[in-house]
Amino acid sequence: MNETYIKDYINLFSHLSLNNIEQFDNFIDKNIIFSDPFNDIKGSENFKKIFYHMFKNVKDPSFIVLNYSKSENKVFLKWKMAFYAFRSKQFIEGLSEITLNSDGKINCHIDYWDSMNGLFIKLPFIGILYALSLKIFKAKI
């Protein structure tokens, strides 16, 4: 596994914009599988559409890769996404599990993050319901 390749992929995420989404083609297999709490897709064009959609619908999104580790054909990234919503800057932290194929291209990218605590509880109606459910179900220790 090429260390420079991984660092270049991380650098792309850290500087991601509408102007450089097409650079993913340098890193991903044309049949990449991508999954996160909202999407399950296959193919490099669909992978890039996820990010075009993000920049269209999310105000000022950015990623910071906090650290990474690698093992054989896998890379794990710990990251923080920042964006503006609900009149303030919001943050979501998550992990990405990235698998490389025998050609060294990324053929699987799975994002793990908590959509309930990271996003949904900040929505007015859902946040109120969530707070009420915590009063019922959360243990008082």
PLM region descriptions:
Residues 3-27:
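Short acidic-aromatic low-complexity motifs
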Residues 56, 62, 70-141:
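A beta-strand edge to alpha-helix "cap/lid" segment located at domain peripheries
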Residues 26-74:
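A solvent-exposed, acidic/Ser-Thr-rich amphipathic alpha-helical stretch
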Residues 1-4, 141:
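Basic/polar N-terminal segments that are highly enriched at the extreme N-terminus
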Residues 8-12, 32, 92-96:
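A generic structural signal for ordered secondary structure
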Residues 11, 38-40, 83-84:
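Short histidine/acidic/glycine/proline-rich micro-motifs that form metal-
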